[in-house]
């Protein structure tokens, strides 16, 4: 696919899971430009707020880093209230002339909450505590839901196994997994 006459940069599958008071968020490491893999070990997740929140991104890297910085500012402004910071970021993202052009999505987990924040102004808190974004997200989400339902694996193991399953299916996802747990 092309965007603005240039090959589209595709990257990533990010998956977060909350289970038994623990949260884990992981991503693969593949970055693809058009139909070419250009990097195998891209880091797409980051810890925030004294390491109690983990965020991941899918989409344009520079845009995502800008949004992560803004999200961290919102967390500081609102005293670490995750939902409030997410809603305020989504509102700014949708209404600000500069921010609205940014093309990325964020997945955010803490031991209590899992959220997806999009540029359309959506802040989504899935009922099952599983968040997934990126090109292989639906494969990883399906695997995580199945593992949650049929195993006693912890959050980190569910994320790892689900991303490996997605990597077997999605051509834009690889098995170089980066994982953080809180």
Curated annotation (Swiss-Prot):
Domain of life according to the entry: Bacteria
Reactions catalysed according to its record: ATP-dependent cleavage of peptide bonds with broad specificity
Activity control: Allosterically activated by HslU binding.
Single biological process term from Gene Ontology: proteolysis involved in protein catabolic process
Main location: cytoplasm
Subunit structure: A double ring-shaped homohexamer of HslV is capped on each side by a ring-shaped HslU homohexamer. The assembly of the HslU/HslV complex is dependent on binding of ATP.
Biological function: Protease subunit of a proteasome-like degradation complex believed to be a general protein degrading machinery.
Stated name of the protein: ATP-dependent protease subunit HslV
Species annotation: Chlorobium phaeobacteroides (strain BS1)
Gene: hslV
